[in-house]
Amino acid sequence: MGDYIVVLEAPIIVKDVESVEEAIEAAVNKVVNALEKEKLDFVRVELGYSKCPVCGAHFESAFVVGNVGLVGIYLTLKVFNAQSLEHAERIAKAVVGRALKKSH
């Protein structure tokens, strides 16, 4: 049994946004509120980054089309007493996923 730090990436859809900055703010707020409702304030929430396949530069994982935003969010948490890294990932997905599904 071991302790593992698990990083999950979640795609968050937000509506009625006009800019990337607004989409990022709305997505982060949505995730933080969902986690706080479930008393999961120990989960670190960060904006995701993508890598350009052409030049290799990193950019914020946020896109807006037709007032709908898609934002990639990284969720980091420590899982205690897991049997393996895969087990820790399953635990993290179950705990965080349950909280995010309730927020829809």
UniProtKB/Swiss-Prot annotation:
InterPro entries: UPF0212 (IPR007564)
Coiled coil: none
One Pfam family hit: DUF555
Native species: Pyrococcus horikoshii (strain ATCC 700860 / DSM 12428 / JCM 9974 / NBRC 100139 / OT-3)
Family designation: Belongs to the UPF0212 family.
NCBIfam families named among the record's database cross-references: PRK03922.1 (NF003035)
Protein name, entry field: UPF0212 protein PH1312
